[in-house]
Amino acid sequence: MPRSLKKGPFVDHHLMKKVLEQNEKGTKNVIKTWSRRSMVVPEMIGHTIAVHDGRKHVPVFITEAMIGHKLGEFAPTRTFRSHVKEDRRSRR
């Protein structure tokens, strides 16, 4: 179920503070965050945010199409190792 519109989007305060500081200074440094639950807001457009996937930080460049989505959607947590095709010769 989506979040109520009257509440507005959720963004962790420490992340929003870093984004606003960089907007004031005009810099575009990579921002590291563990906050996968934070929603992408218009102030983040053009920034690169490194989102933690449980093992490393995955750099995500924020575009207009990402507004309203959560940061965790762009950093997959599971790595899929393809199913190995069975070799018929080795079974005999």
Curated annotation (Swiss-Prot):
UniProt record, GO biological process: ribosomal small subunit assembly; translation
An example Gene Ontology molecular-function term: rRNA binding
Keywords: Ribonucleoprotein, Ribosomal protein, RNA-binding, rRNA-binding
Record GO cellular component, one term: small ribosomal subunit
One Pfam family it belongs to: Ribosomal_S19
Keyword Lipid metabolism: no
Record HAMAP family: Ribosomal_uS19
Family: Belongs to the universal ribosomal protein uS19 family.
Role of this protein: Protein S19 forms a complex with S13 that binds strongly to the 16S ribosomal RNA.
This protein's name: Small ribosomal subunit protein uS19
Gene giving rise to this polypeptide: rpsS
